[in-house]
Amino acid sequence: MTPVLIAFPLSLTLIEYNQATPALYVHYLYKTSLFTYRSADLDYTFYTEKNQHIPENLIANFKSEQRIAEMYHEELKPIFKVNESYILRIDSLGVYDLKAFNPDYIVLSQSPKINLERMLNQFPNTRIIADGSNYKSDVDRWESTCLKKKIPFHNTYEKGFYKIE
């Protein structure tokens, strides 16, 4: 009976290890943007602003708490896809007028000068995430707009990282 009791939890651990689902993490990092993408193969890609370095303590935490096969570092992109979800990142340029694109998540970075109410009219079924690179006054204004329009809002400054699977 003992071999069965030991083998069952071990097999569940192996199944979980081999079936990691891809995920995108939007981190809170003061005055900058940091995303991490986990592939199904447990490869991690850290996305930062151009010429921005990843804090060593964050890398150490990921290495100790996650099963990491490989780590990469790339510059942030405006559009990400995780499983069937599309993520649009709007930075200080405020460019989002994409007619045939309907993102599931919108990440606001570097305090873009946008009319959030107008943008939410264009993308009514989206979730809004504000990362740590935004001014607090902008984040407060966006949060009240989302609350008024009943759109889910996540502030990484208050609630920590956001995970999209």
Question: Residue ranges of each PLM-predicted region?
Answer:
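Glycine- and aromatic-enriched alpha-helical transmembrane segments of multi-pass membrane proteins
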Residues: M1-P22, K31
